[in-house]
Structures are given as structure tokens and as C-alpha cells.
Amino acid sequence: MPNFAGTWKMKSSENFDELLKALGVNAMLRKLAVTAASKPHVEIQQNGEQFYIRTYTTIRTTEINFHIGEEFNEETVDGRKCKSLATWETENKMYCKQTLLSGNGPKTFWTRELRGDELILTFGADDVVCTRIYMRA
């Protein structure tokens, strides 16, 4: 079983602004979000297939607590409430499908994958994908 536990600092980010555009976030809020999320700090606790992930930015802290294969409540990148289900896509990669609880919007998901000493995080909204690469702190 892969060990995601630890503290992670972002090394690079691609397409975050494009992802926010695909989610319908206005230009002013996108600029604020891109600036605030430019240096996120992530802490992951793992006990087998149980995960607790806390992400800190300058404007907010998000927390999710989930077990692989069990639905849980969370929010999309733009703050809409959803039901999520994380499953193993490969031995080192989890895939999480998000289903909005109300309203319409693009199909969203996220993945987290361990590749060597890196944590690869992707967020998707329909066909737009944001990739963020983290290193252990």
C-alpha cells in the first residue's frame, strides 16, 4: 500500500486558472484564488485506506476525511457541495469522482498519485485538467 502520509509543499502548478474558468469562476475571484493557492501546504494522515487531508492556503483551510470505496461529503474546488467517492485507479493512484448535491455544473474529479518522492494532484472539470506537483516538506 502506498504511503501518502506526510507534509507536502507545492513545486509546480499547471492550468489552475483554466480550471477555475471551466468552473465558471469570475475573473476577479480567479485572480484572488490563483494568488492565494500559489503556495498551498498539504498535510496527509493515512491509516490503511482511511485518509485525512488538510490543505492550507492564505485565504482558507480545507479538510477532507474519507475511506477508499465509501462515499463522503466535500466541496469542489469552487466551493460547491458534492458527494465524492475515491477508489484506487492503480496501486499508487486514487481517483475521486465528485457528484454535485444541487445545481448544474461540469463533471468534476480529482486524483492523487505517488510517483517517487512526488505527489501528483490533478483536478478536472469536464475536459480541463489542472496538475499540481508536490514534494515532501
Swiss-Prot record:
Query: What are the GO cellular component annotations?
Result: cytoplasm
What does the UniProt entry say about where the protein is found?
Cytoplasm
What does the record give under GO molecular function?
retinal binding; retinol binding
**Residues that span the membrane, as ranges:** none
Give the main localization category: cytoplasm
Disulfide linkage:
none
Motif Nuclear localization signal: residue span? 21-31
SUPFAM superfamilies, per database record: Lipocalins
Entry keyword Secreted:
no
Q: Which UniProt keywords apply?
A: Cytoplasm, Retinol-binding, Transport, Vitamin A
Q: Does the keyword Transport apply?
A: yes
Give the domain of life: Eukaryota
Q: Which PROSITE patterns match?
A: FABP (PS00214)
Cite the binding residues for all-trans-retinoate. R132, I133, Y134
Family the entry assigns: Belongs to the calycin superfamily. Fatty-acid binding protein (FABP) family.
**What is this protein's function per UniProt?**
Cytosolic CRABPs may regulate the access of retinoic acid to the nuclear retinoic acid receptors.
Q: Which PANTHER family match?
A: FATTY ACID BINDING PROTEIN (PTHR11955)
Q: Please provide the record's free-text comment about the domains of this protein.
A: Forms a beta-barrel structure that accommodates hydrophobic ligands in its interior.
> What's the name of the protein?
Cellular retinoic acid-binding protein 1
Q: To which species is this protein native?
A: Hippocampus comes
Q: What is the lineage of its organism?
A: Eukaryota, Metazoa, Chordata, Craniata, Vertebrata
